[in-house]
Amino acid sequence: MRRARRWIPAMAVLLIAAGCSSTADGDAVADATSSGAAATTTSAPTPWDPCTIPDEAIERAGLNVDTKESGVFGRDQNGFKICGWESRPPSSKYYVRVFVGFETLDFVDDPSYFNRLQPVRVGTRDATQYQQLAADAALNCGVAFVAGAELIRATIITGTQVGNPPYDPCTELNTVVAALDSELPT
């Protein structure tokens, strides 16, 4: 009985090694019959990428295609795909960013981040105009609307070198977004 107990662990190791290899020499490699249940992974859906808006549409909207930036400092944030452009020279007075993510309009109804919500019409869409809490309403504005399962947000940030902009930021943003309307998801 003692002798059998000594060999049981050795036999178990041999059986495991034999089941993991399809060849007699070399390193053990697991084959399909020994791996048990197959693991399936599904990647999370990815929001529509606003950087795919054609350059011609960006130019028609008054933005500079040469200033396109994917993400914020190159990174998407909080599940949103992000793309931004400066206004066209010589003014280069503001920066527009488009954010797309799997959220609802409730996202901008968060009083800890956004305020001054009001309904607006932007192009063919019913939207919600908003301000970020820390933003100067004389220089910045945001607008949001839903397209299918995605929330599309756009923001305008006026450059700090522009003291008193010759435009209303919300009116300017709505004009830019309306010009891009046909390129955005529906």
Predicted feature locations:
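Bacterial N-terminal signal peptides that target proteins for export
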Residues: 1-10
